[in-house]
């Protein structure tokens, strides 16, 4: 069970831009629409064995919600949400079901981890997917310039090892970028500006949490 207080909010990636810092340097930032997310469930060690809060975000047609979830939401007078995620934190008992969490939960200068689903690239070769150098451009190479080369021995070991980097579907996987700095917060518009890039396309779902590394 974690002993660290973790703040978190669900939102969307709006895109990238650039701003100037105090010294006049250009800083690339990603604009995130943070919240409003609603606390839909509070996990406690006494009832669930761990401490966490469940956040809901986005709109969905109530008819698309299954019966168990719909009954729970009606019992607590909650509006159905499209996305749900749990954030483990030691102070979950301080939250209440129905509480709204917005962008002002973070302050400029804080370190955060941002989780999103990367852009899908489809079927890609080893040069694009893994950064292979390919074979020679000349000197006898025939129609194999972008091939991976050897993928294993013949009689020994006589098989292809698991985890061999090969061509395949690229992207559309969950990734987390750690220790991004919050550049600024616009509480009125519900926006977070974080330094650097964030996984996923514009409009993609993101989870912004307190950085787990750093010891602060």
UniProtKB/Swiss-Prot annotation:
Keywords: Ribonucleoprotein, Ribosomal protein, RNA-binding, rRNA-binding
InterPro entries tied to this protein: Ribosomal_uL3, Ribosomal_uL3_bac/org-type, Ribosomal_uL3_CS, Transl_B-barrel_sf
Annotated region described as Disordered, given as residue ranges: 135-156
Pfam family, one: Ribosomal_L3
Any one Gene Ontology molecular-function term assigned to this protein's record: rRNA binding
Cellular component, GO annotation: cytosolic large ribosomal subunit
GO biological process: translation
Function: One of the primary rRNA binding proteins, it binds directly near the 3'-end of the 23S rRNA, where it nucleates assembly of the 50S subunit.
Similarity-based family: Belongs to the universal ribosomal protein uL3 family.
PANTHER family: 50S RIBOSOMAL PROTEIN L3 (PTHR11229), LARGE RIBOSOMAL SUBUNIT PROTEIN UL3C (PTHR11229:SF16)
Assembly and interaction partners: Part of the 50S ribosomal subunit. Forms a cluster with proteins L14 and L19.
Protein name as annotated: Large ribosomal subunit protein uL3
Source species of the chain: Thermobifida fusca (strain YX)
